[in-house]
């Protein structure tokens, strides 16, 4: 069994550069995005070998989908995101890679999207479809946002997720119903979004975000429009909304602002003490400083021989580090007024909680993987070979046979050489150190924050001005949109990875709006 692992050492060598390649490309890629050079960033993803590898294919499509969105090609964006979605749904790691992961790490496997990345695929597609006036498709994607989260919750019911629902999914669903004139369904969607902020009759933040005033107003407006007097009264009393007229003769505009760049993954090392109960065939991994403890029973104990020879393990895990971004808030000026854009989703908080949720479910397997590698190393170090005696007389064979029975119960003094075990153990130690790296791959082009606001439109041409400020209230950027008010609800977005707006001049391939 020990030598089976040795065979893996040569295979693992090919995977050692994966993480370094990603770190190198990440720097190049982010520099281009921050400079607003989306076309060069796209070419980097399209041409680099790293993104062409099968295990990184889902990342390739996720990045290209987000980049196409930045360039205003929403149909192309959905084409890429659909391909990524299919890979997320259908791809399964090969049996060989699963076996290799026992002595390696997740980087040799096809990239597994984080929980929140699974969800982001759907709400970005939903926002794309809303701008393309494809209401039914937008609604499907919004529903899939919540279906996917429910599936993740149901997968391990004894360990429910704290990131168990997504506000943006309900908001996009409500907008799609509004655009189609389905007021009752829109009310339900807005109510579901608002209820995420209500716990035990009190209003409080959800995933680091306070309930937006606009959501309060949308909920009460829908209740009033449907004649749901009791609901309208309850939510006015509970939420205390401060509402302005947000529907004009020309309809209304809902503007989404995607600000900054999402968090990046980095490596973090956590140590665990290994404790055994041989009489009960139990092994326990303990980190007292973090209050973490994992117990394993007889099956694991016997399979890995109680992880003999190791007393501590150090596990490499990814953590999310938020990135700095210069823009802090934005005001939207429209004919007749001005409104502050409100945060709807903080992806820094969502990403961190999503990772914690996953670790709560998967850390035990990672500990077994690491302990198995170190147990192999300890086993290799124990290998000894019998020393050869160059002066031994071959004619003594007959005498040895003769005394075989006499020496049967006697312990024979034999000298052993530990050199081979030392070499093999050291080799395995080097490989363990090199391969025990956290998987720091992630979807780079997601924003750090998503804000939104609804404003009324007049009939005909509307000039909308969006002014962006830093945290010191200094104006850094202004952007103008020209919207034709035709009496309907319209959705648009602006994107600021850094301090520059990448909003396209026009949305492509829109379906005609039905009267």
Residue ranges and their predicted role:
Residues 15-38:
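Bacterial Sec signal peptide processing site at the extreme N-terminus
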Residues 27, 63, 67, 117-120, ...:
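"A position-specific structural signal for the A-helix of alpha-solenoid helical repeats
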Residues 38-39, 74, 135, 183:
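TPR-repeat structural position
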Residues 53-57, 88-98, 150-158, 194-233:
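Boundary/linker segments of alpha-helical solenoid repeat arrays
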Residues 79-89, 143-147, 181-202:
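TPR/TPR-like (Sel1-like) alpha-helical repeat modules
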Residues 391-515:
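C-terminal soluble interaction/assembly domains
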């Amino acid at each position: 069994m020990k030598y089976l692992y040795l065979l893996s050492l040569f295979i693992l060598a090919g995977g050692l550069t994966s993480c370094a390649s990603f770190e190198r490309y990440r720097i190049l890629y982010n520099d281009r995005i921050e400079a607003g050079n989306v076309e060069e960033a796209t070419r980097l993803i399209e041409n680099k070998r790293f993104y062409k590898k099968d295990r990184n294919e889902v990342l390739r499509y996720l990045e290209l989908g987000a980049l196409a969105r930045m360039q205003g090609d929403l149909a192309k964006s959905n084409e890429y995101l659909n391909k990524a979605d299919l890979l997320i749904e259908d791809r399964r790691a090969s049996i060989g890679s699963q076996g290799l992961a026992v002595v390696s790490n997740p980087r040799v496997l096809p990239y597994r999207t984080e929980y929140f990345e699974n969800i982001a695929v759907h709400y970005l597609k939903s926002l794309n479809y809303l701008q393309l006036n494809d209401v039914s498709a937008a609604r499907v994607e919004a529903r899939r946002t919540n279906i996917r989260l429910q599936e993740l919750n149901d997968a391990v019911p004894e360990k429910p997720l704290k990131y168990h629902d997504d506000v943006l999914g309900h908001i996009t669903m409500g907008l799609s119903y509004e655009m189609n004139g389905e007021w009752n369904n829109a009310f339900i969607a807005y109510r579901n979004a608002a209820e995420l902020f209500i716990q035990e009759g009190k209003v409080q933040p959800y995933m680091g975000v306070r309930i937006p005033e606009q959501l309060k107003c949308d909920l009460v407006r829908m209740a009033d429009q449907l004649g749901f007097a009791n609901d309208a009264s309850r939510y006015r009393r509970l939420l205390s909304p401060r509402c302005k007229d947000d529907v004009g003769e020309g309809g209304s505009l809902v503007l989404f602002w995607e600000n900054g760049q999402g968090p990046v993954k980095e490596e973090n090392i956590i140590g665990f003490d290994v404790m055994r109960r041989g009489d009960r065939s139990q092994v326990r991994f303990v980190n007292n400083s973090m209050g973490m403890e994992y117990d394993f029973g007889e099956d694991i104990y016997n399979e890995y021989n109680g992880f003999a020879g190791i007393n501590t393990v150090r596990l490499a895990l990814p953590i999310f580090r938020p990135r700095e971004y210069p823009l802090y808030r934005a005001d939207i000026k429209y004919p007749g007024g001005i409104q502050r854009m409100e945060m709807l989703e903080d992806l820094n908080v969502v990403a961190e909680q999503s990772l914690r949720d996953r670790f709560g479910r998967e850390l035990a397997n990672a500990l077994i993987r690491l302990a198995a590698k170190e147990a192999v190393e300890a086993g290799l170090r124990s290998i000894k070979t019998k020393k050869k005696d160059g002066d031994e007389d071959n004619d003594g064979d007959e005498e040895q046979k003769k005394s075989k029975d006499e020496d049967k119960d006697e312990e024979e003094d034999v000298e052993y050489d530990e050199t081979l075990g030392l070499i093999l153990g050291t080799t395995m130690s080097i490989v363990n150190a090199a391969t025990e790296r956290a998987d720091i791959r992630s979807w780079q082009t997601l924003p750090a924050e998503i804000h939104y606001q609804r404003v009324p439109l007049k009939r005909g041409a509307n000039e909308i001005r969006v002014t962006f400020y830093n945290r010191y209230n200094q104006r850094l950027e202004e952007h103008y949109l020209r919207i034709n008010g035709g009496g309907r609800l319209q959705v648009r977005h602006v994107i600021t990875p850094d301090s520059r707006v990448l909003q396209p001049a026009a949305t492509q391939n829109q379906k005609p709006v039905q009267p």
